[in-house]
Amino acid sequence: MNDITKRPSGRTADQLRDVRITRHYTKHAEGSVLVEFGDTKVICTASIAESVPAFLRDRGQGWLTAEYGMLPRATHTRSDREAARGKQTGRTQEIQRLIGRALRSVFDLERLGARTLHIDCDVIQADGGTRTASITGAFVAARDAVAKLLATGRIETSPITDYVAAISVGVFDGIPVLDLDYDEDSQCDTDMNVVMTGDGGFVEIQGTAEGVPFSRDEMNKLLDLAQAGIATLIAKQKEALESKGE
């Protein structure tokens, strides 16, 4: 795509931010990752519990669940901790459910056995795309946690059936663009989050017009951008998992 845009970052329409995935970022979790989409930075951990929720007892399968949060000063101005307010915001609940759905789409939960994989995504710096970065990083953390289950003989076969990653797209300055940062997200005409698997299947598409409706042609262009961007992200995941320390 050669469309000329006036993106605040100076990126071309189809250009991702610099993406980095750092494994084994914290000491205690079975899987831990620092994922960076430009200036957006998220710590993703995967922890194993040898139990399942009550609704899955005696069912012979496991569960994967996710939680999401932001440090008070992850954004331009400080926000109170949700624990101090006594409740999670609707946004937080929506995002952590999305992360859980995205990862469960590539898990065979029966192979996991009667245990739970807890995914925690904590945003330490936000510049747009925190939910998509969380999904992309959390998958790598989950892979490392599963590798430990395999290495210790607690499971015989990996429950992971494919890769999964996510990216944002939108219409900015009249042009479909990939991987919106905060400045673009706050000014765009359309904002869309797309989750896809390694084999090209769609897990979730969240799209909203921010005042100016988008056409079917624009939606198709956005999905094409997202598909190409996610293919690059999955290549980054594979590169990280193949790096020393796997």
From Swiss-Prot:
Annotated keywords: Nucleotidyltransferase, RNA-binding, rRNA processing, Transferase, tRNA processing, tRNA-binding
Pfam families per the UniProt record, alphabetical: RNase_PH, RNase_PH_C
Top EC class of this enzyme: transferase
Protein EC: 2.7.7.56
CDD domains referenced in this protein's UniProt entry, alphabetically: RNase_PH_bact
Residues that hold phosphate according to the record: 91, 129-131
Any GO molecular function: tRNA binding
Catalytic activity line of the entry: tRNA(n+1) + phosphate = tRNA(n) + a ribonucleoside 5'-diphosphate
Signal peptide region: none
One GO term (biological process): rRNA processing
Family: Belongs to the RNase PH family.
Assembly mode: Homohexameric ring arranged as a trimer of dimers.
Function summary: Phosphorolytic 3'-5' exoribonuclease that plays an important role in tRNA 3'-end maturation. Removes nucleotide residues following the 3'-CCA terminus of tRNAs; can also add nucleotides to the ends of RNA molecules by using nucleoside diphosphates as substrates, but this may not be physiologically important. Probably plays a role in initiation of 16S rRNA degradation (leading to ribosome degradation) during starvation.
Record's protein name: Ribonuclease PH
Originating species: Paraburkholderia phymatum (strain DSM 17167 / CIP 108236 / LMG 21445 / STM815)
